[in-house]
């Protein structure tokens, strides 16, 4: 993805890997769009790699960030990333463009009250 951003004109020193920070995206890049006005082009990029034709999954945090950051949030999907001809697809504002197509899959862990009571044991004085 760094190579793609470099090809798009983003300076290497202005491309950051931020995935470990749990910000809702993997890369942050910025560049001067217009030197006269000082306008800056900012991209917050979530990267997904999947076999061609397979759905991608965004975390709740990633989806909410896509909604919040709108035009500055980009989804980069690499189809067949381990194949001979990986194909990069870029989508600016994925929330705005894909909200109609998303399917929400909610996962949680339900623990019965009885199990909680049984596992709690006696309360010991401090």
Q: How does the language model describe each region?
A:
Residues 47-64:
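Short beta-strand-loop-alpha-helix junction that forms the active-site gateway
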Residues 72-126:
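Domain-level recognition of nuclease-like catalytic cores that cleave nucleotide substrates
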Residues 3-33:
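A short acidic/basic microdomain associated with nuclease active sites
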Residues 21-22, 36-39, 68-71:
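A structural signal for short secondary-structure junctions
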Residues 5, 27-29, 41-51:
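Conserved catalytic cores of phosphodiester-cleaving nucleases, focusing on short active-site segments
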């Amino acid at each position: 993805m760094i190579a793609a951003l470099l090809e798009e004109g983003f300076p290497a020193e202005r491309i950051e890997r931020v995935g470990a920070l749990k910000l809702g995206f993997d890369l942050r890049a910025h560049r001067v769009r217009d030197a006269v006005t000082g306008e800056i082009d900012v991209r917050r990029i979530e990267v997904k790699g999947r076999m061609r034709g397979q759905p991608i999954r965004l975390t709740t945090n990633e989806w909410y960030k896509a909604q919040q950051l709108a035009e500055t949030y980009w989804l980069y999907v690499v189809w067949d990333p381990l194949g001979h001809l990986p194909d990069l697809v870029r989508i600016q504002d994925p929330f705005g463009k894909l909200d109609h197509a998303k399917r929400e899959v909610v996962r949680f862990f339900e623990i019965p009250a009885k199990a909680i009571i049984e596992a709690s044991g006696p309360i010991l004085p401090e």
